[in-house]
Amino acid sequence: MSLIRRSNVFDPFSLDLWDPFDGFPFGSGGSSSGSIFPSFPRGASSETAAFAGARIDWKETPEAHVFKADVPGLKKEEVKVEVDDGNILQISGERNKEQEEKTDQWHRVERSSGKFLRRFRLPDNAKPEQIKASMENGVLTVTVPKEEAKKPDVKSIQISG
C-alpha cells in the first residue's frame, strides 16, 4: 500500500505536469540543472492544489461541535462561514493570485485561482445562532455550541401494600 498521494490527470487543480524532457541535457528546463532554457518556478501549482483540497476536521466535544479547516495563505476576508436553511453549515473560500516576473530576456505573468466549498448538516442539538469563527496561522476554527442535554424528569412512585 502506498502512502504517496498521486495526482489525477482529470483534476483541474492537480497541476503536477509531467515533463517528457525532464532529465535530458537539452530538456525544457523544468528541473534539469544542465538545461540551456530558463527554469520557471512551479510553486503556485502546489499551493493551488493544497488550497483546492482544503482539509476540514469535525470534532464533537461535550459543549460544542468544532470544525477546523486548513486554509494556508488565505486571509479572513477570503473565507466565508454561513448557515443555510437553519442547520447547514457552509464553509467556502476563494483565492486569486497573480505572480509577475521580469528579466532582460523574458516577462512572465502566472495567474492561479482556486475555490473550495464544504457543507455540513448540523445535528439537532446545535445552536446555529451562536456560531463563532476565528482564524489563526492558516487554520479556520468554527465553534457551534450545543444545547444542554435535557435531564430526564424522574418521579418516584410509592408502592402501597
Curated annotation (Swiss-Prot):
Pfam families per record: HSP20
GO biological process, one term: protein complex oligomerization
InterPro entries: A-crystallin/Hsp20_dom (IPR002068), CS_dom (IPR007052), HSP20-like_chaperone (IPR008978), Small_HSP (IPR031107)
One cellular-component annotation, GO: nucleus
Expression triggers: By heat shock.
Keyword terms: Host-virus interaction, Nucleus, Stress response
SUPFAM superfamilies: HSP20-like chaperones (SSF49764)
Domain annotation sHSP: ranges: 47-161
One GO molecular-function entry: unfolded protein binding
Subcellular location per the Swiss-Prot or TrEMBL entry: Nucleus
CDD domains: ACD_ScHsp26_like (cd06472)
Subunit structure, as described in the record: May form oligomeric structures. Interacts with the rice stripe virus movement protein pc4.
Family under the similarity heading: Belongs to the small heat shock protein (HSP20) family.
Protein's name in the database: 17.9 kDa class I heat shock protein
Native species: Oryza sativa subsp. japonica
Lineage of the species this protein comes from: Eukaryota, Viridiplantae, Streptophyta, Embryophyta, Tracheophyta
